[in-house]
Amino acid sequence: MLWDLKLKVGHSSRTIADCLRLGREDITIRTALLEHRFLAGAADLAYTLATRLTSELFRKTGAEFIEAKLAERAARHQRQGGQRYVLEPNVKEGKGGLRDLQTLYWIAKYIHGVKSPADLVDRGLFTREEFDTFSAAEDFLWAVRCHLHLIAGRASDVLSFDMQVEVARRMGFE
């Protein structure tokens, strides 16, 4: 159904052994496994996967994960020009964009086992104000990105000059 709606859906079908093996070999796959979710089927199998990922893949590899994610971030920033303040930002991949927020959350989830960014407050990792700022930034960037996609009629992550006025208008800015 999701494909019929022309939605891009990340998915894979693997055994638990394959998940563990591939997760050890590839940090991108490991990150995807960190974000896995049960949709339908054998709930006991999903529980076994989650338990084994935590005990056999995530536990005791936090430093390795952080190092890899920070290296990915540095490479991504370099590809985007390395600038924080740009006139036509990439809202997904640029400095301060959605991927930076996701990276921060993925690291917290990996290290502390949180289920949502709100859990960071309960764990004392974010103050309520920091969480509110994080959430507002994430909501804003997602809204900008969704408007870019709707206006362009395709995936588009660069807030170019020709898109800025229309995105601002749609978001209620004068």
Predicted regions: what is each one?
Residues M1-E174:
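A nucleotide- and high-energy phosphate-metabolite-utilizing enzyme signature
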